């Protein structure tokens, strides 16, 4: 470990000072240190494409109809190395798409199909994703053919949608525009368990206590355990899990039944063999396996002998066509528990008619019992789900429509507003879960609006805080939130504690009048007021600047807003305004780091924003924590100057709070939180703080602050990209 080349005879001929797969990392030595890696993902060093490559422009050149035609052909082009069940890959492709999109959760907007992350660990090796590597490999010739014009993320979702079309479903539509990532995400918390299918994510016995933000019951599953809670069949208990997990994916009861039934109308489960004979998952597989996992090198392991979930059988009589057979079998037969050949619990019908049995995947002369999982039986046993299932059974057209819409929602939920959808099949209808915003006016007198704002009695802190609060809800994970729409003036945002409702009401009354007078949207005026505040603050510090501004934001209405769906965007903490709603188990600086990542900011952008906001008087409820200046309202680098000044000493006072005292005299000069002090204690953040504290970087500080501020204000302006 001394950085020298090891002996070529008895040692490893690698310079061990440069870590590859071995060695002790910094996080192993200092596990409690603030890990900034989640802010430094997906940069040009990992991306093989040219710096000016723009997928969203490239995909517009795609021959959409030719691609869809090729996907239709793929569905029935069975390959000997991985033969299609009944000669149709539809079920496999749908499962791939479902499991990509189904990892999304509303709490933080992470997961989902928007990045093509199923290609990488851990998802490519999850127990719930067994053999989906084969689906992606089957798609490779099409990806190879269309190249840069189609991302893996788009192709994975489109394949499932085309699969449904090829089996007779009229789909609701499709939007292209998902951009690929090139390495595993570092910011997604999948759970703390150290083993697959671990379930240490509940607080006691209540199934409602599933740890936030998780939306799956066990490590490595997408939703629920198909055999039952912790592998023990009990449809009513499983119904609780289904309701919680689908709810955390923003699905209501009707959408949940539709998705469960529609997903199981086609395809089958695979468990006709010994699961112990499967090889390692893709990440652990041997190099000669070329990224494929779960290979059975002992027995046949394909076709009718495939093992995936361990459950064995199809749900319906005709698993390659869209019909109402799922409800027919589920509701008309009694079911009993059986074990699959692989030893998994499954439900099979009692006294089923021979003609209602699906045929064997290879020999149509052989028929097998259909099966139901414990989650399927929940659709029959839970009274609410049962009522919905019976309606779907009686009205197949209604079921098909509800499912098509729910499938579209499932596969597009993390794409953000409809303006981001690309292609000829984008539905014209605006859906409330897309958080629609009307187009805003761009042709008003911006200078006149700024003059009216400057002449108002609003303070710099009031203007900047309101703009920040409006914009900070943006999540790069699912492209929700942000300032466009000015939903800060609507329920529930106007009443959030973090938005200081009393102060907000006062500011909005003034800004709404200015919007009316000038023809601007309230959304634009809110951001413009923040910019005016910053320009005033910079002038007070001796710098004349113009903060960039792009008009065109619209104002959403209550009718365009699903108020309940915005609850998950409520800030319960904001390190930028030095505020915690309450004390949490997670350290304040880690909470800020998570929020920073969701906003799409880097570590140095986080640093300069905190330092600037502290001196502008933007702390929540006007607290003085971290306000290391006697020139509040002037955009100075005082925060960094005083943070790095060794004439000061930092003394804990109470939980997460500190006093800054003169090292010699001992008098209290300022107070601070952990969020303030981390910029001097963390070695990386301190290196940034020192840059901004330098005498020659006062101008750079303002320049970088304005750039980071503008990035936040425009984060949801997809029309500017």
UniProtKB/Swiss-Prot annotation:
Cross-link for Tryptophyl-tyrosyl-methioninium (Tyr-Met) (with W-98), residue positions: 223-249
Compartments (UniProt record): Cytoplasm
Cofactors that this protein relies on: heme b
Single Gene Ontology MF annotation: metal ion binding
CDD domains per UniProt: catalase_peroxidase_1
Gene giving rise to this polypeptide: katG1
Catalytic activity: H2O2 + AH2 = A + 2 H2O; 2 H2O2 = O2 + 2 H2O
Free-text description of this protein's post-translational modifications in UniProt: Formation of the three residue Trp-Tyr-Met cross-link is important for the catalase, but not the peroxidase activity of the enzyme.
One protein family per Pfam: peroxidase
Protein name: Catalase-peroxidase 1
Residues noted as binding heme b in the record, renumbered to the chain: 264
Family of this protein: Belongs to the peroxidase family. Peroxidase/catalase subfamily.
Listed EC numbers: 1.11.1.21
Annotated NCBIfam families: cat_per_HPI, PRK15061.1
Role description: Bifunctional enzyme with both catalase and broad-spectrum peroxidase activity.
Source organism (scientific name): Legionella pneumophila
Primary location class: cytoplasm
GO cellular component terms, A-Z: cytosol
InterPro entries reported for this sequence: Catalase_peroxidase, Haem_peroxidase, Haem_peroxidase_sf, Peroxidases_AS
Site (Transition state stabilizer): 95
GO biological process: cellular response to hydrogen peroxide; hydrogen peroxide catabolic process
């Amino acid at each position: 470990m001394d950085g020298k080349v090891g002996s070529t005879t008895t040692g490893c001929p690698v310079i061990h000072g440069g870590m590859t797969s071995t060695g002790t990392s910094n996080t192993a030595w200092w596990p409690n240190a603030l890990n900034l890696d989640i802010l430094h993902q997906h940069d040009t060093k990992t991306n093989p494409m040219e710096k000016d490559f723009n997928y969203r422009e490239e995909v517009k050149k795609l021959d959409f109809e030719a691609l869809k035609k090729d996907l239709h052909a793929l569905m029935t082009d069975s390959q000997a190395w991985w033969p299609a069940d009944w000669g149709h890959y539809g079920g496999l492709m749908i499962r791939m798409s479902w499991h990509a999109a189904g990892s999304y959760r509303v709490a933080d907007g992470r997961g989902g199909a928007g990045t093509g992350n199923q290609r990488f660990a851990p998802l490519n090796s999850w127990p719930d994703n067994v053999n989906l590597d084969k689906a992606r490999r089957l798609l490779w010739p099409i990806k190879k053919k269309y190249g840069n014009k189609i991302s893996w993320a788009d192709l994975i979702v489109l394949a499932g949608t085309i699969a449904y079309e090829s089996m007779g479903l009229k789909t609701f539509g499709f939007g292209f525009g998902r951009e690929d990532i090139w390495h595993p995400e570092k910011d997604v918390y999948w759970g703390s368990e150290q083993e697959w299918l671990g379930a240490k994510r509940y607080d006691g016995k209540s199934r409602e206590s599933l740890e936030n933000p998780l939306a799956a019951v066990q490590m490595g599953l997408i939703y629920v355990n198909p055999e039952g809670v912790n592998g023990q069949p009990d449809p009513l208990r499983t119904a609780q899990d289904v309701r919680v997990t689908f709810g955390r994916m923003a699905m209501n009861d009707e959408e949940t039944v539709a998705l469960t039934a529609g997903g199981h109308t086609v395809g089958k489960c695979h468990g006709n063999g010994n699961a112990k004979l499967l090889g390692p998952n893709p990440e652990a597989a041997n190099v000669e396996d070329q990224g494929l996992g779960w290979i059975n090198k002992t027995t046949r392991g394909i076709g009718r002998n495939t093992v995936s979930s361990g459950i064995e059988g199809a749900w319906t009589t005709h698993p390659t066509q869209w019909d109402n057979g799922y409800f027919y079998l589920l509701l008309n037969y009694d079911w009993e528990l059986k074990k699959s050949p692989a030893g998994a619990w499954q439900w099979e019908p009692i006294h089923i008619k021979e003609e209602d049995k699906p045929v064997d995947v290879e020999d149509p002369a052989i028929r097998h019992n259909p099966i139901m999982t414990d989650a399927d039986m929940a659709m029959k046993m839970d009274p609410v789900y049962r009522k919905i299932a019976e309606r779907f059974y009686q009205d197949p057209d209604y079921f098909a429509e509800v499912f098509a819409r729910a499938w579209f929602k499932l596969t597009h939920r993390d794409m953000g507003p409809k303006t981001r959808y690309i292609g000829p099949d984008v539905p014209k209808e605006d859906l409330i879960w897309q958080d629609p915003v009307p187009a805003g006016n761009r042709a008003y007198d911006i200078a006149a609006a700024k003059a009216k704002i400057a002449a108002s009695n609003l303070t710099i802190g009031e203007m900047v805080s309101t703009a920040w609060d409006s914009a900070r809800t943006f999540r790069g994970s699912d492209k929700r939130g942000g300032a466009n729409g000015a939903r800060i003036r609507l329920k529930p945002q106007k009443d959030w504690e973090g938005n200081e409702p009393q102060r907000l009401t006062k500011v909005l009354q003034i800004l709404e009048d200015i919007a009316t007078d000038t023809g601007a949207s309230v959304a634009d005026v809110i951001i413009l007021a923040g910019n005016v505040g910053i320009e005033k603050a910079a002038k007070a510090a001796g710098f004349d600047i113009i903060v960039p501004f792009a008009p065109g934001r619209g104002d959403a209405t209550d009718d365009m807003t699903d108020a309940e769906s915005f609850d998950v965007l409520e800030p319960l903490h904001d390190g930028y305004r030095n505020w915690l709603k309450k004390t949490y188990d997670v350290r304040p600086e880690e909470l800020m780091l998570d929020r920073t990542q969701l906003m799409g900011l880097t570590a140095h952008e986080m640093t300069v924003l905190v330092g600037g906001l502290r001196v502008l008087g933007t702390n929540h409820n006007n607290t003085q924590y971290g306000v290391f200046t006697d020139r509040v309202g002037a955009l100075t680098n005082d925060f960094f100057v005083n943070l790095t000044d060794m004439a000061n000493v930092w003394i804990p006072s109470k939980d997460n709070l500190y006093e800054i005292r003169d090292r010699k005299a001992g008098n209290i000069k300022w107070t601070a939180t952990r969020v303030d002090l981390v910029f001097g204690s963390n070695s990386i953040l301190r290196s940034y703080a020192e840059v901004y504290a330098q005498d020659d970087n006062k101008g750079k500080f303002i320049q970088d602050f304005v750039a980071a501020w503008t990035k936040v204000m425009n984060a949801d302006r997809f029309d500017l990209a």
